[in-house]
């Protein structure tokens, strides 16, 4: 076994040998020099010592657990001021649990049972020698350690003895000092007590003397005070009696002087007169009682000393009252009693016993209790959407004339019954110093919310998807639907383009699908927006040979705004010039990414003509519908959307409705915007009668009171009276808002027309077969307006052209446009008699083009200047009575009589005028061509010189186009 010295171990531990020797000696290992040998047992003892010195327990140490428990309580305690304080008291308890190691006996038993390894004799001898050496070393070390311990014990005993002796001496000294201090304190206390006894005796004697003197003085003062109080009381009683007598005498004299001569009446007659005055008086001008004049004169003679009125002196020196005090404060209290009386209760509801009492007391009370308003009253005015001038004045408690004056200050002339919009009314209220709030009307539509909550617990069942087909015009939307429906709808549309929004439901092998076919022409933007609003999935049809067009981009925007998934159908792939890859790239630029590029929009190549890819398209649509998990309640009142509406001459108003939830049945009461009614008949898209329609099914209903606006929400109500009430409320609201907006825009239009000058207007009356077409046509025509010619839509409606339309056109000098409608016999005869122009169209852009041409004819023609010749002045002749005549040579073009000319001298225009005469030799001629000489004179210009150039031109008018 390799031997290790103290120096080597110190080098391994990076410590000095001296420090290691000190630690070995402290651990009980007797090593004196760095060359001593250290065995493994020495190292173990050193390690155990180091562990104990650093607080680390060995393996045989006990394991303990300390448990700490805290309890908190409160104690209420009063302090010196009497306030109660709460003191928090915390009690801590600690418990230590010790567990002995159970593995030690087992480890010892295992160590005993372990067999010794087999070693040879040489190894045994070497080990015996090492053990002997270690035993000797251990004995030597133990002896040295024992000696060191004995020396340390002796030294510790000596140190402890010295410490005890020192402590005993200190205790003795402290006892002596304490005894001495006690003796000194006892002596001082004795002296102090003696001094205190003598001073206390002197103080008691002095206090007794002072108390006796003070008692004598207090007794004398009490006697003097009692005598003075008695004399003062006698004087006050005598003075009060004299003052009361004088006041009574003065009052009697004053009453005698102020009392006018009058006929005395019995109390019953006075009460009758007071009752009559109360009956004949009014709120603002109560009738004065009999004694009011006397009281008024009496008040005038009295000095004005009240704080609620101001007094001024007139020319005669008489005091005249000027203030807020009215006649009711001077009268006897027998006027008309009002709830808002401010006379201190004299003439009000809570007056004295029947208003009786002293007149002077009543007058003083009324004058002292009345308070004049110090600032104007600020009212909170709730302004509805529309309000008349009279109602607005009533809300502010002012006269209507004040509101009219304020409106005139704001630059508007109004009448008392004129309707103001909410914004204008709120401005007027704030200008007049009140607070304006937008009022919430008693809206009957709130009943719709309450009614809709009753059916929120209906069972939700799967419903068919609503698919809208959108795209550019002539890209094959309707043809694609034709192939799906196996019909020929496109051939029936005028011009081969769709001008109505069509709703169909198709039963396929995979389920029912409802299709909405929207127009692709640019004029039908609102129709496409309604289609996207009501849809679940959008099929975007793009022609493979045409690519992405403006209406394609618009359809993408509508679909994204509605948040519905898009399925792209690349149509017309059977054409030779079809390029589907170009279409994909263009759609990627519009943020429509195909699935193969990592997007979420499936692209399906189809051919509506050949039927290629149609089945794949339907499969993609149904796959998207499954992902959406479309559900709707069936056993509930129906809700839906007006897809299209029209007026039939025989059937009346007809509306195409797409049911979104619930079941619509024949006989239900429906509300659509401002139209209501009971469903008299219900037809499907094929014109066949049906009794009910579930979710996602389009139907055509009859029985409404008027033609509803396309896009309105349809609701089924249980009560027809409630439906009529809501419809009438919406009609009145729409009318009031429309009138208010028109009135607000009148002044602005007048100012615009004054600034722009005269503007040509083309008044039109538009009648169409369905609501959507009329709306699209009106919007397209209004877009044609320019700064010089403006389209004015006098009236737009649905249905045939009637006599009332012709009369309106006669009054407004308008042109009637009929889109897919005709005029009846009476209307035609009336139009011929009045010279009214009626135009019929069935294609929307034909109507737009003709109106555009008519507006172009109304434009002022454009004036263009054309140079027709150049003339050089060769010689100038002065002719009496005529002036200067220029002899000229036509160098370019020709010269005509009465042509316009410019005189250029050194390439500078010095005159612009007209020819007066044109002659060749002595003959008047109409024109002179290039290369010929002529003589000419210019109107109002005689300063012609040789070498001048004449530029001959003419102005032509050119018709302008939009």
From Swiss-Prot:
MF annotations from Gene Ontology: GTP binding; GTPase activity; guanosine tetraphosphate binding; translation initiation factor activity
Sequence segments annotated as region (G3): 517-520
Basic and acidic residues bias locations: 52-77, 123-183, 197-250, 267-278
Stretches for region G5: 607-609
Compositional bias of kind Polar residues: 78-87
Annotated GO CC locations: cytosol
Transmembrane segments: none
Domain tr-type G: 462-631
G1: annotated span: 471-478
Amino acids binding GTP: 471-478, 517-521, 571-574
Chain spans, region G2: 496-500
Biased composition (Gly residues): 342-355
UniProt-annotated stretches for the region G4: 571-574
Subcellular location: Cytoplasm
InterPro entries for this protein: DNA-bd_dom_put_sf, EF-G-like_DII, EFTu-like_2, IF2_assoc_dom_bac, IF2_II, IF2_N, P-loop_NTPase, Small_GTP-bd
Entry keyword annotation includes Transmembrane: no
Chain residue ranges for the region called Disordered: 52-87, 121-378
Keywords, sorted A to Z: Cytoplasm, GTP-binding, Initiation factor, Nucleotide-binding, Protein biosynthesis
Record bears the keyword Ribonucleoprotein: no
Main function: One of the essential components for the initiation of protein synthesis. Protects formylmethionyl-tRNA from spontaneous hydrolysis and promotes its binding to the 30S ribosomal subunits. Also involved in the hydrolysis of GTP during the formation of the 70S ribosomal complex.
HAMAP family: IF_2_B (MF_00100_B)
Recorded family membership: Belongs to the TRAFAC class translation factor GTPase superfamily. Classic translation factor GTPase family. IF-2 subfamily.
Protein's name in the database: Translation initiation factor IF-2
């Amino acid at each position: 076994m390799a031997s290790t010295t103290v120096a080597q171990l110190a080098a391994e531990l990076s410590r000095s040998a001296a420090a290691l020797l000190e630690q070995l000696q402290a651990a009980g290992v007797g090593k004196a020099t760095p060359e001593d040998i250290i065995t493994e047992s020495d190292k173990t003892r050193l390690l155990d010592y180091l562990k104990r010195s650093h607080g680390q327990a060995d393996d045989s140490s006990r394991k303990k657990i300390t448990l700490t428990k805290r309890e908190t309580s409160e104690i209420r305690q009063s302090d010196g001021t009497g306030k109660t304080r709460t003191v928090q008291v915390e009690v801590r308890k600690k418990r230590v649990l010790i567990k002995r190691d159970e593995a030690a006996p087992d480890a010892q038993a295992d160590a005993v049972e372990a067999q010794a390894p087999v070693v040879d004799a040489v190894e045994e001898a070497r080990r015996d020698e090492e053990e002997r050496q270690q035993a000797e070393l251990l004995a030597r070390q133990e002896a040295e350690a024992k000696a060191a311990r004995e020396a340390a014990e002796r030294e510790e005993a000596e140190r402890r003895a010295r410490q005890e002796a020192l402590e005993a001496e200190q205790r003795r000294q402290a006892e002596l000092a304490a005894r001495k201090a006690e003796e000194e304190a006892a002596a001082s206390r004795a002296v102090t007590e003696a001094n205190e006894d003598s001073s206390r005796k002197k103080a008691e004697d002095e206090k007794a003397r002072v108390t006796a003197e003070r008692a004598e003085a207090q007794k004398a003062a009490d006697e003097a005070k009692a005598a003075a109080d008695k004399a003062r009381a006698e004087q006050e009683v005598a003075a009060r009696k004299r003052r009361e007598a004088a006041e009574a005498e003065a009052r009697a004299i004053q009453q005698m002087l102020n009392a006018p001569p009058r006929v005395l009446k019995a109390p019953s007659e006075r009460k009758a007169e007071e009752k009559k005055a109360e009956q004949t008086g009014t709120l603002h001008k109560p009738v004065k009682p009999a004694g009011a004049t006397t009281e008024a004169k009496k008040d005038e003679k009295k000095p004005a000393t009240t704080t609620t009125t101001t007094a001024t002196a007139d020319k005669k020196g008489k005091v005249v009252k000027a203030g807020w005090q009215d006649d009711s404060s001077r009268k006897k209290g027998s006027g008309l009693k009002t709830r808002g009386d401010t006379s201190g209760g004299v003439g009000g509801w809570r007056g004295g016993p029947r208003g009786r009492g002293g007149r002077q007391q009543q007058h003083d009370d009324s004058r002292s209790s009345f308070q004049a308003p110090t600032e104007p009253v600020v009212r909170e005015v709730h302004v509805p959407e529309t309000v008349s001038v009279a109602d607005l004045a009533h809300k502010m408690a002012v006269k209507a004339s004040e509101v009219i004056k304020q409106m005139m200050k704001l630059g508007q002339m109004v009448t008392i019954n004129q309707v103001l919009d909410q914004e204008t009314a709120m401005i007027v209220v704030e200008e007049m110093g009140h607070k304006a709030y937008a009022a919430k009307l008693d809206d009957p539509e709130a009943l719709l919310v309450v009614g809709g909550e009753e059916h929120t617990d209906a069972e939700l069942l799967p419903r068919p998807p609503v698919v809208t087909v959108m795209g550019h015009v002539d890209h094959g939307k309707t043809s694609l639907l034709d192939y799906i429906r196996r019909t020929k709808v496109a051939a029936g549309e005028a011009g081969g383009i769709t001008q109505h929004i069509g709703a169909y439901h198709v039963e396929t092998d995979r389920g029912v699908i409802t299709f909405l076919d929207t127009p692709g022409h640019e004029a039908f933007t609102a129709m496409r927006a309604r289609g996207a609003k009501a849809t679940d999935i959008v099929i975007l049809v793009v022609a493979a040979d045409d690519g992405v067009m403006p209406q394609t981009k618009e359809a993408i925007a509508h679909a994204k705004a509605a948040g519905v998934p898009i399925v792209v159908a690349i149509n017309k792939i059977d054409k030779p010039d079809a390029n589907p890859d170009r279409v994909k790239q263009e759609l990627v630029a519009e943020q429509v990414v195909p699935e193969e590029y990592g997007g979420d929009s499936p692209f399906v190549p189809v051919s509506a003509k050949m039927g290629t890819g149609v089945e794949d398209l339907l499969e993609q649509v149904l796959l998207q519908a499954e992902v959406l998990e479309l559900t709707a309640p069936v056993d509930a009142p129906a809700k839906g959307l007006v897809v299209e509406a029209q007026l039939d001459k025989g059937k009346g108003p007809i509306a195409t409705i797409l049911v979104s939830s619930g079941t619509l049945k024949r006989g239900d009461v429906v509300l659509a915007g401002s139209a209501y009614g009971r469903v008299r008949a219900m037809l499907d898209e094929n014109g066949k009668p049906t009794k009910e329609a579930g979710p996602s099914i389009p139907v055509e209903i009859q029985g409404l009171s008027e033609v509803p606006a396309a896009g309105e929400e349809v609701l089924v109500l249980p009560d027809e009276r409630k439906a009529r009430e809501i419809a009438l409320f919406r009609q009145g609201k729409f009318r009031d808002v429309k009138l208010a907006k028109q009135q607000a825009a009148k002044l602005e239009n007048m100012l615009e027309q004054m600034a722009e000058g005269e503007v040509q207007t083309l008044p039109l009356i538009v009648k169409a077969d369905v609501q959507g077409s009329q709306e699209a046509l009106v919007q397209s025509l209004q877009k044609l307006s320019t700064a010089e010619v403006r389209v004015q839509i006098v009236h737009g409606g649905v249905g045939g052209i009637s006599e009332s339309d012709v009369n309106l056109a006669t009054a407004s000098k308008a042109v009637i446009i009929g889109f897919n409608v005709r005029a009846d016999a009476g209307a035609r005869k009336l139009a011929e008699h009045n010279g009214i122009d009626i135009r019929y169209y069935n294609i929307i852009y034909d109507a737009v083009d003709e109106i555009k041409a008519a507006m172009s004819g109304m434009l002022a023609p454009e004036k263009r200047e054309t140079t027709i010749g150049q003339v050089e002045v060769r010689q100038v002749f002065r002719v009496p009575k005529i002036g200067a005549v220029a002899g000229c040579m036509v160098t370019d073009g020709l010269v005509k009589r009465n042509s316009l000319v410019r005189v250029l001298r050194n390439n500078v225009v010095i005159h612009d005028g007209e020819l007066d005469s044109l002659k060749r030799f002595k003959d008047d001629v109409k024109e002179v061509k290039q290369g010929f000489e002529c003589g000419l004179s210019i109107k109002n210009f005689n300063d012609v010189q040789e070498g001048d150039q004449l530029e001959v031109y003419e102005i032509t008018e050119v018709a302008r186009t939009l």
